[in-house]
Every structure is written in C-alpha cells, then in structure tokens.
C-alpha cells in the first residue's frame, strides 16, 4: 500500500465522478458564515522547511527537564537499565507492527514470542497461566476485579489503600458503571494493610480482595498469609498487584496461594513514557483460564506434526457475543510484551535477582543516610521496604522539590498530588540506575536546601 497524496488530476477525476466542481462543494451543506468563521479562527501558517521544523521541535523539547537530571521518581514507573539488545530485537520488522497476529500461518514468530512471554511471566510469578498482555497495571487490576465477580457471582470488591491511587481511580471507573461495590481498607501504623479492619469488613458477599506488594508507599506487606486465609475463608479471590523486579528477592505470589496476579510490566525493559505504552501483566490459576480477559497464545501441533502457535481462548467481544465476552479489551500490548520477554530472557533469574538486590541495598543506604545525616523524618520507619520509601520535610513538598530541580535532581513524587492532607511528604524511589555518586549528591543537595530554610 502506498501513502502518496492524491494528484490534482486524481482529485479532478473523483470530483467529476460525484458531479462536483471543487472540494469546497463537499461542504456546501454547512452555512457560508460558519465556514468563513472557521477559516478565520483556524488560520494555518505556511509549512516551514524541514530544517526550521526540526529546530522548532527542539526548542519546544528544551522546555522539558532533560535526561541529565538525576531521577528518584517511582510510584509505578521506574528508571531501570534497558540492555540495547532489547531494543534491537523489538525493532525487528517482524515484531515492530500494530498488526494483530490473527493469521497463524504467517505469524509464527510473533506468536511464539508472545508464548515465551507468557511462560516467563508464569516462571516469575509461580502462576499456572498468563495472558498475552493488557494495557497497563490500572486496567489489569480492574480486569482482575471483574474476573473475581464473574467467577464468584458476587458484586463486592475490597481494595487496600496501599494500592496505587491511580489504579484505584481506574478501578472505580470500571466498577461503578457495573454497580459493583468497592470498599477501601486503610493502612495500619506500619503502612501495611490493616488486617483487623479487613476482617471486620470482608464477608461472604465479597468477590475479591486486592493488595499491592510492595504497596504504593514502598512498604512490604508482611501479613500476606493471614490475609490469604481471611480471603479464602470467605470464599473470595486473592488478587495481588506486584512490582516484577521485586520478585527477584521476594517470594513469588504462588507461595501465598494468590488467585490472580496483576502488575505493571514497564520495569521489564520498557522505557519511561508519558502516556505509555506500558504493559499490563495478568496471571492466574489454570482453573480460571476461561475467565481471563484478552487472549492467550497456545502451543499446538499442525497437520504435518510440527509444533505451532495460535491465538486461543479469545473470549473477547469482537469474537463472541458481547454478553458472553470476558472483556472488551481489544488490541493488546504485544510489542511491549515481546520487549519484556527479551529483557527477562537476557537477564534470567540471576540477573533479575541481582538488580533487585542492588535496588534494595541502595534504597536502604539512602534512607539510612537521610535519617542519620540529614535528620529527615521517615514515614513508616519500622516497616520493611523494597526500593521506595516516604520522607517528611519541613515545608510544602512541591516547593521543596522545585528547589531540588534547580540542582538537577528529581527528588521524588509529592504525596499531595494524591492526598491533599499529605503536603509535606515525598515518595522516593531508588533503582540500579542511581549510582553511589548520585546518592551522595542527593544527600549533599538535601542538606543545602534544608539549610536555606
């Protein structure tokens, strides 16, 4: 297919065919005064040269904070190192396409890659089956909640307030339109899900309980086994939201008898991007395979006895009746899933464990220095954490962070963005990309900013 614009001759022939003299005649039904007003309001300047256009774009881009800034941002999207090989493979013409592999006879490479992604996610989480991907963690959590409703036949979902607030927002959007009740469970003094409060609010009417580990504040949930027993005692499903890299050192969800695992796959070789594309992970027990949203790539044997791969269990609304469909999830994040598969395959279990250990140790080193040398107060000081923690500062967090930006440091996320009453707290994340020199510079800059106050 070519993408050349129509020539004047072609335009003339098309107009002759429909009995018109000019393109303007196509809009004759719109009153002249409205068309004239539109022309005046939407004056498009003459197109610049390619050189001038590139310079203009560069000037606009300079308004952004550059890549040379030291970043301690997290909250669901993290700056991890991406091996060049991941991008190299992802840009293969076979993979770098928006085409959905509906024709298995010409799509074996893509289908096998997605199959490998599913297998690697199962290895990482310990679950029995994973789907071919979802959009991102927020919609993945909402889809998991809907799965629990379909499986149990009950219409009440409980979520911990340790869940990323943006995920909770997406969850509310999905559930309220279907008249599914959502209860939010608070955290205890250690920043973990309040198990006593959960016990008082869960009931036989509950379809599923959603916990995030580590939670939005970086805290590791240490009572997952107690939570699991409480959930299954009430015949509900246990839904766990994960940070994939943390599984390098934390127990896999399967060891807590989790029913559905969801998570954001951006940390698995996918670059940071405002608006994505990211990757929604969803894995579950085999008994729930027919309630999985989206699609699964399965392995089969063709007529010649050769191994092959096909899309299977596509219970989506464009394949079957909408009333019978498990989801209206359409195009998946296949390219992101392939990137994640390449990343996991390159690093292997030892590599992911090493990255997790570095994130863990450097985050603990930074927090300890902040406590002892900068005298910053730590929110949830007695909790266990992976690579994120919350600090308290003596002034408005957004103003404080702007002062750090002047030193080319993105110091963290102000919690006031999500919680109005927490305007003096900052969520700080550390990854393997943060060198010891950067940690030292952050400590030095904190001292200087606090000294000026």
UniProtKB/Swiss-Prot annotation:
Keywords: Oxidoreductase. Pfam families: GDC-P. It comes from the Bacteria. InterPro entries: GcvPA, GDC-P_N, GDC_P, PyrdxlP-dep_Trfase, PyrdxlP-dep_Trfase_major, PyrdxlP-dep_Trfase_small. The keyword Oxidoreductase applies. Gene3D superfamilies: Aspartate Aminotransferase, domain 1 (3.90.1150.10), Type I PLP-dependent aspartate aminotransferase-like (Major domain) (3.40.640.10). One of its GO terms (molecular function) is glycine dehydrogenase (decarboxylating) activity. Its EC number is 1.4.4.2. GO terms for biological process: glycine decarboxylation via glycine cleavage system; nucleoside metabolic process. It catalyses: N(6)-[(R)-lipoyl]-L-lysyl-[glycine-cleavage complex H protein] + glycine + H(+) = N(6)-[(R)-S(8)-aminomethyldihydrolipoyl]-L-lysyl-[glycine-cleavage complex H protein] + CO2. The keyword Oxidoreductase applies. PANTHER family: GLYCINE CLEAVAGE SYSTEM P-PROTEIN, GLYCINE DEHYDROGENASE (DECARBOXYLATING). HAMAP family: GcvPA. Belongs to the GcvP family. N-terminal subunit subfamily. The glycine cleavage system catalyzes the degradation of glycine. The P protein binds the alpha-amino group of glycine through its pyridoxal phosphate cofactor; CO(2) is released and the remaining methylamine moiety is then transferred to the lipoamide cofactor of the H protein. The glycine cleavage system is composed of four proteins: P, T, L and H. In this organism, the P 'protein' is a heterodimer of two subunits. This is Probable glycine dehydrogenase (decarboxylating) subunit 1.
């Amino acid at each position: 297919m070519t993408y050349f614009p129509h020539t004047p001759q072609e335009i003339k022939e098309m107009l002759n065919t429909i009995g018109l003299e000019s393109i303007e005649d196509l809009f004759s039904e719109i009153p002249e005064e409205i068309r004239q007003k539109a022309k005046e309001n939407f004056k498009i300047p003459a197109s610049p040269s390619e050189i001038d256009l590139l310079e203009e774009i560069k000037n606009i881009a300079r308004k952004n904070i550059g890549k040379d800034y030291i970043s301690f941002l997290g909250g669901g999207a993290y700056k991890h190192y991406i091996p060049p090989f991941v991008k190299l493979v992802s840009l293969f013409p076979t993979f770098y396409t928006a085409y959905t592999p509906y024709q298995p006879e010409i799509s074996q490479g893509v289908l096998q890659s997605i199959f490998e992604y599913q297998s690697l996610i199962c290895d990482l989480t310990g679950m029995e089956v994973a789907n071919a991907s979802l959009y991102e963690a927020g919609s993945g959590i909402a889809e998991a909640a809907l799965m629990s409703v379909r499986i149990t036949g009950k219409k009440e979902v409980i979520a911990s307030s340790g869940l990323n607030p943006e995920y909770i927002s997406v969850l509310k959007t999905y559930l309220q339109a279907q008249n599914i009740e959502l209860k939010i469970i608070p955290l205890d003094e250690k920043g973990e899900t309040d198990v006593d409060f959960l016990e008082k609010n869960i009931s036989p009417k509950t379809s599923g309980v959603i916990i995030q580990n580590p939670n939005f504040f970086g805290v590791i949930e240490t009572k997952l086994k107690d939570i699991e027993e409480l959930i299954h005692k009430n015949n509900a499903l246990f839904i766990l939201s994960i940070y994939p890299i943390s599984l390098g050192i934390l127990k896999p969800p399967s060891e807590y008898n989790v029913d559905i695992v969801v998570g954001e796959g951006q940390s698995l070789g996918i670059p940071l991007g405002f608006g994505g594309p990211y990757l929604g992970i969803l894995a579950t027990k085999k008994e729930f395979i027919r309630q999985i949203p989206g699609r699964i790539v399965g392995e089969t044997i063709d007529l010649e006895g050769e191994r092959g791969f096909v899309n299977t269990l596509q219970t989506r609304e464009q394949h079957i009746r909408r009333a019978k469909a498990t989801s209206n999830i359409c195009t998946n994040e296949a390219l992101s899933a392939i990137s994640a598969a390449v990343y996991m395959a390159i690093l292997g279990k030892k590599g992911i464990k090493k990255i997790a250990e570095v994130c863990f140790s450097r985050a603990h080193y930074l927090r300890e220095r902040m406590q002892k040398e900068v005298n910053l107060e730590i929110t949830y000081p007695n909790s266990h954490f992976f690579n994120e923690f919350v600090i308290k500062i003596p002034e408005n967090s957004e103003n404080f962070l702007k002062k750090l930006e002047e030193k080319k440091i993105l110091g963290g996320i102000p919690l006031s963005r999500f919680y109005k009453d927490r305007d003096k707290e900052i969520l700080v994340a550390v990854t393997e990309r943060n060198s010891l020199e950067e940690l030292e510079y952050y400590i030095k800059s904190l001292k200087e900013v606090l000294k000026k106050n």
